[in-house]
Amino acid sequence: LERNPIFWSCPMSNKWLIDIVDSDFLMHDMFGPARKYGYHLIQTEVTAIDRDKKQVRTAHGSIEYDYLILAGGIRYAYEAWFGNDRVAADYTRKNFPTAYIPNAEHLALKRKIRNFTGGTIVMTLPPPPHRCPPSPYERACIMAWWFKKNKIPAKIVILDPKPNIAPIGMGFRQAFEELYPDIITHVPNAKIREVDPFNKKIKTEAGDFTFNDAILMSPHQASDLVWMADLIGKTPEDKPTGWADIHPTMLHAKADPDVYVIGDSMGAISPLFGHYPKSGHVANAMGRIVAQYIGLRLADKEVKPILPDNLCYMLVNGEPREAIAVKFEYNLRQDGLIEQHQYDIDLRSADLVEEDFVWAKGLYNDFLSA
């Protein structure tokens, strides 16, 4: 069940903003692969999930299931800023789009960058966890490169709720200071207190800011599908965490062993580090892992934990094209906890750009080749 008529790749889409890749590179047909691999693809909108009846209701009718996999990604949590003020939320979404969900926001953001003639662009970063943690910094770099190339008198102010740039902190810091010292300003500990989109003002714990234009990234949460299924976790204070409450290695919901949640909607999986990175690489790995789990269950075989890895490349310079990267590896300790090992590749290089394209094409060929 897929809402969108085509596949649009959020990974690599920052490069599309400055024409390093074209639309054909990001857009892929999904019906051809469905025919090739022998599964049914229905383009529809999910309207409700009834776990007691094992039924998913859609705009085209109801479907019963034995196993359910929820892979809906994220949703924007504008209510963290505006409460129930839908006017402010809708105004922000329309005028200061973030383009972290595949939709028309990407085109709106590209137009915003191309039409900008000068002034200050503020970019708010969501608090962790959020989709693709290093990508806002990459976006700032490629925007800065575009403005520098076209001699546009622009300033980019990154309001970061974290105390430090992460991940790939040194690599991004060097890019900011060496390539774009007069364009990019990174403000740490800038947790949002108040957003006034109508008057273009933001209050943070690091000070107050005004802007000519902005990319206002609200906090992220699990997709609507997880909320429909009533599988959102709770804090010790009994407040919603915003993310699915799942078994850390088996990946099914703690409340329902026949419902799996994969990709960016997943909640924390280890007290040692919290969440898996919400990346396309991890999401793809989780799809493969859960497919194996269900196959083993159907065959009445033992299901043993399988852990993913993660790999992200980030473009920081458009000419010459240079990237940095980060790798994550995971292992299961004897006490049953998942352990994370992070390796930042801070030295920007053209080789990493080539590796990025090899990675992306490999992933597309893995599940989108017809």
How does the language model describe each region?
Residues 323-370:
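C-terminal auxiliary extensions adjacent to catalytic cores
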Residues 36-49, 55-56, 63, 145-242, ...:
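A Rossmann-like FAD-binding core segment of flavoenzymes
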Residues 1-40, 127-168:
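Beta1-alpha1 glycine-rich phosphate/pyrophosphate-binding loop at the start
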Residues 120, 153-157, 258:
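Residues at the starts of beta-strands that form the adenosine-phosphate
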Residues 262-308, 314-315:
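A conserved FAD-binding loop/helix module that cradles the flavin
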Residues 164, 305-324:
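Flavin (FAD/FMN) cofactor-binding core of flavoprotein oxidoreductases
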